[in-house]
């Protein structure tokens, strides 16, 4: 991300404009610490800080710099981490994972539409708002509307 950002910004400066989005993830703001995800989350936190610096350093240049926070996506890497858990550990995590996770193909079209609409630096495009999280927990726990995101992966 660091080197890619450097190369992109150099090119944007030469052409007089451009748009850069950095992908956040994990606990990029340090609010939620997930066991076993320390290194990954630390790198995402550093990307958040890098993005803030890039925004500041490229004001009034014609370069738009923003970030994307896609939420917890079910990726191959994420699935591999879950498969390392014991059956009991996974069964404890599965109900919450069904509430907070999403498939990439669910989130990606929305993110793209938000990128197309945005022309401001400093914007964080975030799929999972606090309202959305609370609504999902309400639907799952009160309305008993359960999601099953993982059976298609055999876990």
Predicted regions and their residues:
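Catalytic loop of short-chain dehydrogenase/reductase
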Residues: 13-14, 19-46, 51-52, 56-59, ...
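Short beta-loop-alpha junction of Rossmann-like oxidoreductase domains
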Residues: 31, 72-83
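C-terminal helical subdomain
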Residues: 67, 85-138, 142-143
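Short, hinge-like loop/turn segments at secondary-structure boundaries
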Residues: 38, 83-86
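Hydrophobic positions on the long internal alpha-helix
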Residues: 4-8, 50-51
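Functional cleft and adjacent loop/helix regions within the main domain
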Residues: 144-155
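Short alpha-helix in the Rossmann-fold core of NAD(P)-dependent oxidoreductases
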Residues: 1, 5, 43, 100
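Structural signature of the Rossmann-like NAD(P)-dependent dehydrogenase/reductase core
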Residues: 3-5, 18-25, 64-69
């Amino acid at each position: 991300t660091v080197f890619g950002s450097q190369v992109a910004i150099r090119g944007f400066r030469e052409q007089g404009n451009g748009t850069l989005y950095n992908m956040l993830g994990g606990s990029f703001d340090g609010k939620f610490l997930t066991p076993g995800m320390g290194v990954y989350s630390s790198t995402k936190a550093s990307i958040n800080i890098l993005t803030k610096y890039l925004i500041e350093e490229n004001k009034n240049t014609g370069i738009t710099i923003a970030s994307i926070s896609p939420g917890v996506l079910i990726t191959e890497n994420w699935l591999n981490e879950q498969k390392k858990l014991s059956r009991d550990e996974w069964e404890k995590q599965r109900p919450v994972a069904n509430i907070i996770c999403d498939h990439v193909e669910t989130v990606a079209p929305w993110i793209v539409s938000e990128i197309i609409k945005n022309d401001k630096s400093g914007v964080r495009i975030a799929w999972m708002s606090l309202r959305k999280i609370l609504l999902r927990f309400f639907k799952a726990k009160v309305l008993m509307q359960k999601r099953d995101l993982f059976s298609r992966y055999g876990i």
